[in-house]
Structure formats: structure tokens, C-alpha cells
Amino acid sequence: MKRIAVLTSGGDAPGMNAAIRAVVRQAISEGMEVYGINEGYAGMVAGDIHELSARSVGDIISRGGTFLCSARYPEFAKLEGQLKGIEQLKKHGIEGVVVIGGDGSYHGAMRLTEHGFPAIGVPGTIDNDIVGTDFTIGFDTAVTTAMDAIDKIRDTSSSHRRTFVVEVMGRHAGDIALWAGIASGADVIVVPEEDFNINDVVDRIKAGYDKGKKHSIIVLAEGVMPAAQFAEELKAAGDTSDLRVTELGHIQRGGSPTARDRVLASRMGAHAVKLLKEGRGGLAVGIRNEQMVENPILGTAEEGALFSLTTDGKIVVNNPHKADLELADLNRNLSI
């Protein structure tokens, strides 16, 4: 394989630039040419493709976001969109593609491989909800950003003896809430993976004030419900504290990536190139117990594949990701 391309797709995540840099420089070290595709699959279909050099990716390792830009492009799920994208790849002489993004991006990589263009998925999302890997690119930075924000909220919360409900991102996963909540000493963490009783939350907050606490922090994963609605339910259940709501929002997707995300992205990007060099495709890279691994994107659960097809052609997730609820138990023991 002599010429490959790299793209970022879906929501951006800190560390994507570090992954792009690793793909480009590892490929050049392997004697390959590298092309960048702007704005994900939309750019592929539009032919927005250009050659990258080692200098093209200089000084981007510390930058958040993705300098190739990203976009959601549902049209690529259709055969017509895939064929248009493949036409552009052929036009530029591209033989393989590295796709950095979430599970939707992986589906596109799988389709490219089926059409004869080996593609490797690299997990880039702050949500940490991709199967086949312990951690995704961007998660550590998002947790650090959320922790820093909660630390600041704690300052004002304690000054006014208030209860704060802090909503963090994560889509349907509670990883950011759990990690940021524990790191910031939250009193209560509420995640989608665990049932909760609103009356128990009220009792826990009241018990804290009765023990002499001056404030309370509740970290809420966005996949549970909006923070404003959660606050209303707290009041309806009898909470009498001075309650405030903060939604951290997209600040969690920005900012300079942490050292861990930079190193993780560099390792994953380089590993993806090595797989393409071997002519392999239809795989997603990941990290398990600090070691690089790869899994088939599509297949059976027994084969270790991330996704499988039902008899009616629908894509389903094998062994869906769930946040580590041992962390939830840990927080309940520590937040007394």
C-alpha cells in the first residue's frame, strides 16, 4: 500500500489532531503518501482531498478539535453516497483510509472495506462509549475539563451554602460523570447505567447538610435527563436547599488535550497505519490493559467483532459499553 488517507468524522474530541499527526508521520516513515480528507465523509464525497506532509501536521499535537474539520454525513449510510466517496478515492489513487471518530464513523469504515478499500477505525469521542477499547481519544481531556469546572463551582457553592446540579456530557454513557464526579468529590453522581430514586438523592443531600456540610454537588450525566428537569424533580420530592443548575456543555469537547490523550492518540494513529501497511481493513484499534489491540468492526460477538448484522440487515452492538459501576459504589463510600 503506497497511498492512504485520513479523516475525522462525527463530534470532535481533543486529541484528534495528535492522531492525525501520528497517522501522517508514521505513514511517511513507512514510505507511504498521505492525504487528508476535510469534513469527514462529506468531504470524501465532495472530493475535498489534499496531500499532507510531515510539516502539514507540525505544531498541531497541542491543539484541540481537528484541523481537518469534521461533519456528520448520514448520506454515507446509503449505497449512493458510498459509491460517490469511493469514486473520489480512486480518482486520488488512495488505497486505504484511517477513520477517526465514533461508532457511526466505524460503520462508514466498514462499508469502505466491503467495497475493497481497507479502512481502520480509531476511537475518537469524549463519551468513552466505544466497545473494544478501555479508553477513547478525548475522554481524559473532557474529564479534566469537567473536573476543573466542578472545582470552580464548588468554590461558589460553598460560599453561599448552595446545592449545584452539574450536567456533564457523555451521550448515553456515564463515564464522564463518574470520573469527573469522583475526581471533584461530588456528593451524588447520577448515571444512565444505574437506576436511581429521587427521594434517595434528596435524603442524601439533606443528610449531608445535617452533618455540617456547607454545600452539595450533584454530577448528572446528560443521558439521564436535563439538569433543569432533574432540579424540578428534586424540589417536587422535598428538597429545601438553595438549588442551582449548571450545564457544562460543549466546553468539554474543546481545549488542549491532556498528556494521556496525546500519547493515546499517537499510539492509536500509528497502530492504524501499521495495520493498513499489512493490507488489513475492517478493523478498529483500541487499548486494553495499556496494550494496542484491534477488533473486527463487523462480525460475531464470538469473533470479538464490535458490531453484527441481524437477519433483517440492522447493525447492532455486540457487548454494548457500560460505565464501571464499581466507581459509583466507590463514590457513595467516599462522599459521606
Swiss-Prot record:
Descriptive protein name: ATP-dependent 6-phosphofructokinase
Any one GO biological process: fructose 6-phosphate metabolic process
Assigned EC number: 2.7.1.11
Keywords (A to Z) from UniProt: Allosteric enzyme, ATP-binding, Cytoplasm, Glycolysis, Kinase, Magnesium, Metal-binding, Nucleotide-binding, Transferase
SUPFAM superfamilies the UniProt entry points to: Phosphofructokinase
Binding residues for substrate: 125-127, 162, 169-171, 222, 244, 250-253
GO molecular function: 6-phosphofructokinase activity; AMP binding; ATP binding; fructose-6-phosphate binding; identical protein binding; metal ion binding; monosaccharide binding
The keyword Transferase appears for this protein: yes
Description of activity control: Allosterically activated by ADP and other diphosphonucleosides, and allosterically inhibited by phosphoenolpyruvate.
Compartment(s): Cytoplasm
Cross-referenced InterPro entries: ATP_PFK, ATP_PFK_prok-type, PFKA_ATP_prok, Phosphofructokinase_CS, Phosphofructokinase_dom, PKF_sf
Subunit structure: Homotetramer.
Pathway(s) it belongs to: Carbohydrate degradation; glycolysis; D-glyceraldehyde 3-phosphate and glycerone phosphate from D-glucose: step 3/4
Binding site for Mg(2+): 103
Cofactors (names): Mg(2+)
Family: Belongs to the phosphofructokinase type A (PFKA) family. ATP-dependent PFK group I subfamily. Prokaryotic clade 'B1' sub-subfamily.
Listed Pfam families: PFK
Source species taxonomy: Bacteria, Bacillati, Bacillota, Bacilli, Lactobacillales
Residues at which ADP binds: 21-25, 154, 185-187, 211, 213-215
Primary location group: cytoplasm
Lineage top rank: taxon: Bacteria
Active site: 127 (proton acceptor)
PROSITE patterns referenced in this protein's UniProt entry, alphabetically: PHOSPHOFRUCTOKINASE
GO cellular component: 6-phosphofructokinase complex
